[in-house]
């Protein structure tokens, strides 16, 4: 594993072998990165998320497998609405 300058790796995060973390990468708590990847500069990974592919510079990712954070949170909002609608009487 290689780490660039200014990286932040929070508790219980894992990085598999031969992975390269570029400068200013942030891995939040309980996140993971699979092996043989190049994590681009400025990438941010949300807690409890996992990266399976190389990233683009400045990417903000969430989920497992990781997707753009904005898309991930939209999906979670839709799932919440579906759950509420399921219990609503017609």
List PLM regions with ranges.
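Structural signal for interior beta-strand "rungs" in well-ordered beta-sheet cores
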Residues: 1-68
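Terminal amphipathic alpha-helical/low-complexity segments used for targeting or macromolecular assembly
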Residues: 59, 64-90
């Amino acid at each position: 594993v290689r780490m660039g300058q200014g990286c932040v790796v929070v508790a219980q995060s894992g990085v598999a072998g031969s992975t390269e973390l570029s400068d200013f990468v942030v891995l939040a708590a309980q996140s993971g990165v699979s092996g043989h990847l190049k994590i681009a500069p400025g990438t941010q990974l949300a807690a409890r998320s996992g990266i399976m592919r190389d990233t683009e510079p400045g990417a903000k990712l969430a989920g497992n497998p990781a997707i753009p954070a904005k898309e991930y949170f939209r999906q979670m909002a839709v799932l919440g609405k579906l759950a509420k609608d399921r219990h609503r009487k017609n």
